């Protein structure tokens, strides 16, 4: 059975690419045509890629691989956090901080600092500090929660990075490739398919398209880990 149907992708707007002048010629193999100056993605090929991505991700999860979801643009942020949490993956959905992968030792220390501050807050230790000091600590806590909250469960580097917008997340792509971490990547018509191991050509700007793809990837991870793809926690985004 197909992982995703053509009607589901059409309804989600997964076929809409970027303006033709903004395309990457390497994506030509996944483009069906151009209409009114906009490239239309070939959803038959997207369906094939989704099947491949599902099987690849499921097998990776079955073998114990750890996943990191990355998508920091506004329309993807909530979906990234939701679907990563549903399948037990780590995530970055606000801003990619330089060195998140390539300077992992330093990043791990900052995550540990976040955990320490959370313990201090929950125990009342921060409230017992002088007002000014408590304010500084809470500001630090809020900032770390915003940018590193999705990484608290990540004990070491991920084995796979799942990416929403390749062009926006250039630094994440470069760091993953430098460390030979495979990328499962949504690819709009302005992307480079040569920069990922598992391509999924589709609209990476529409919330419903992002939800459809990440939802299936989360299903694959759950199936690989637990033998079933729990879809109960899925949400719909307008």
Curated annotation (Swiss-Prot):
GO cellular component: cytosolic small ribosomal subunit
GO terms, molecular function: structural constituent of ribosome
Segments forming a coiled coil: none
Keywords on record: Ribonucleoprotein, Ribosomal protein
NCBIfam families: rpsB_bact
Similarity annotation: Belongs to the universal ribosomal protein uS2 family.
HAMAP family for the chain: Ribosomal_uS2_B (MF_00291_B)
Name used for this protein in its record: Small ribosomal subunit protein uS2
């Amino acid at each position: 059975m197909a992982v995703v149907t053509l009607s589901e992708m059409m309804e989600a707007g997964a076929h809409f690419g970027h303006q033709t002048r903004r395309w990457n010629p390497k994506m030509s193999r996944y483009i069906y045509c151009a209409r009114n100056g906009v490239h239309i993605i070939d959803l038959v090929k997207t369906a094939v890629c989704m099947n491949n991505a599902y099987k690849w991700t499921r097998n990776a999860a079955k073998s114990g691989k750890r996943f990191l979801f990355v998508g920091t643009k506004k329309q993807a942020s909530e979906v990234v956090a939701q679907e990563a949490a549903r399948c037990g993956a780590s995530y970055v959905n606000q801003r990619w901080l330089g060195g998140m992968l390539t300077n992992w030792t330093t990043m791990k220390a900052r995550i540990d600092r976040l955990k320490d501050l959370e313990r201090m807050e929950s125990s009342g230790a921060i409230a017992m500090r002088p007002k000014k000091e408590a304010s500084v600590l809470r500001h630090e806590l809020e900032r770390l929660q915003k940018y590193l909250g999705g990484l608290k469960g990540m004990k070491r580097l991920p084995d796979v990075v799942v990416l929403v917008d390749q062009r926006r997340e250039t630094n994440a792509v470069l760091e993953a490739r430098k460390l030979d971490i495979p990328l499962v990547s949504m690819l709009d018509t302005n992307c480079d398919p040569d920069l990922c191991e598992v391509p999924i050509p589709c609209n990476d700007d529409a919330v419903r398209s992002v939800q459809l793809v990440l939802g299936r990837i989360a299903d694959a991870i759950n199936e690989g880990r637990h033998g079933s793809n729990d879809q109960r926690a899925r949400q719909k985004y307008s």
